[in-house]
Curated annotation (Swiss-Prot):
Key words, A-Z: Cytoplasm, Stress response
Any single biological process term in GO: response to heat
Organism of provenance: Escherichia fergusonii (strain ATCC 35469 / DSM 13698 / CCUG 18766 / IAM 14443 / JCM 21226 / LMG 7866 / NBRC 102419 / NCTC 12128 / CDC 0568-73)
InterPro entries: Hemimethylated_DNA-bd_dom, Hemimethylated_DNA-bd_sf, HspQ
Keyword Phosphoprotein applies: no
Highest classification ranks of the organism: Bacteria, Pseudomonadati, Pseudomonadota, Gammaproteobacteria, Enterobacterales
Protein name: Heat shock protein HspQ
Family: Belongs to the HspQ family.
Length: 105
């Protein structure tokens, strides 16, 4: 069983670039099409660890979807980010939906 370090709805930071993001989905292992060596320089050990679908904002404040290895992310300690309120709102919305899912008949 593979354990993930981060959860859905959790705010994280890109370890190298410092961008704030919100985890929206988790894959236990790398699950996109097998990359060519030119596309993604990732070793097999990294591919076997959890990968995260993370929504971040680009330099213009527009949301972008990223696919990142667990090793590329770090925990975000602050809950409020006045410079990026949309990321705070996204995280709150996801956590709220996970706590009280709507039933559909």
């Amino acid at each position: 069983m593979i354990a993930s370090k981060f959860g859905i709805g959790q705010q994280v930071r890109h370890s190298l670039l410092g961008y704030l993001g919100v985890v929206v989905d988790i894959d236990p292992v790398y699950s996109l099409a097998e990359p060519s060596p030119d596309e993604l320089a990732v070793n097999d050990e990294l591919r076997a660890a959890p990968w995260y679908h993370v929504v971040m904002e680009d330099d213009n404040g527009l949301p972008i979807h990223t696919y990142l290895a667990e090793a590329q992310l770090s925990s975000e300690m602050r809950e409020e980010h006045p410079e990026q309120p949309s990321m705070d709102e996204l995280a709150r919305t996801i956590r709220k939906q996970l706590q009280a899912p709507r039933l559909r008949n």
